[in-house]
């Protein structure tokens, strides 16, 4: 049984109650955490319930789009950035998307039978940044650095991305009968103002990964230098290793044509 339930009614209160994260379990949409608590596999000392903390919503702010961590995934399905909307539409079903949150999806740990966190790939490709708080204070960092680092003791507050024109491409494979978990997905974006290419993959490892080597070489086979695919109930590492270069090549080709 949870010893204490915390119900902040503002972002400032949530930050204060979370502190450095010691002994605090974050409950956002609850699609992952609540079943674990109900099954007795997770027994939080403190449960921080964020549904009243005012951390939801999408807004424009000085040339940036800011997405609150508690924004439902469903709210992104008609987002102006099509690659983000496209990815959101393929996450689970509408009922789950109405509860699942952007911050929760980004931070979702890999399950025993599948990889999670589909939104990480388009957010990396779009150059998005995460604002979080917790141990060490508040910080803003690129999504790829946040995912690659130690997220223990971090509370995600919002995600921000620059409002610039981009050419984008995204594709992936998934099994509809496997709760829509991706076998592999690749997303790419090229900024119109600078020509910068960014590529990311999701569904193949415990978190989404930026494909830095491929960005430099434009060689799809180099993707396996950037990511080591894993085995799970959805697909084998060998199968992912075989299809990933094909998905990268398709993304590069589409970006060159547009």
Across the structure, where does each feature detected by a protein language model lie?
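C-terminal structural segment of proteins
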Residues: 1-258
């Amino acid at each position: 049984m949870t010893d204490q339930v915390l119900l902040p009614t503002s972002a400032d209160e949530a930050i204060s109650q979370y502190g450095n994260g010691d002994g605090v379990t974050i409950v956002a949409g609850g699609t992952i955490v609540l079943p674990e608590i109900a099954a007795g596999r997770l027994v939080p000392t403190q449960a921080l319930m964020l549904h009243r903390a005012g951390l939801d919503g999408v807004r424009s702010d000085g040339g940036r789009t800011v997405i609150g961590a508690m924004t439902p995934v469903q709210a992104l399905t008609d987002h102006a950035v099509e690659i983000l909307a496209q990815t959101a539409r393929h996450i689970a079903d509408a009922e789950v998307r109405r509860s699942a949150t952007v911050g929760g999806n980004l931070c979702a740990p890999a399950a025993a039978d599948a990889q999670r966190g589909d939104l990480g790939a388009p957010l990396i490709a779009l150059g998005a940044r995460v604002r979080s708080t917790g141990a060490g204070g508040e910080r803003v960092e690129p999504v790829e650095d946040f995912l690659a680092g130690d997220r223990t003791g971090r509370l995600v507050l919002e995600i921000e991305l620059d409002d610039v024109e981009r050419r984008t491409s995204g594709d992936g494979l998934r099994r509809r009968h496997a709760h829509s978990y991706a076998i592999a997905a690749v997303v790419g974006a090229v900024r119109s103002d600078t020509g910068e290419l960014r590529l990311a993959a999701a569904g193949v490892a415990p978190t989404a990964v930026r494909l830095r080597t491929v960005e430099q070489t434009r060689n799809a086979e180099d993707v396996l230098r950037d990511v080591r695919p894993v085995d799970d109930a959805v697909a084998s590492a060998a199968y992912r290793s075989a299809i990933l270069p094909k998905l990268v090549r398709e993304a590069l080709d589409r970006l060159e044509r547009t």
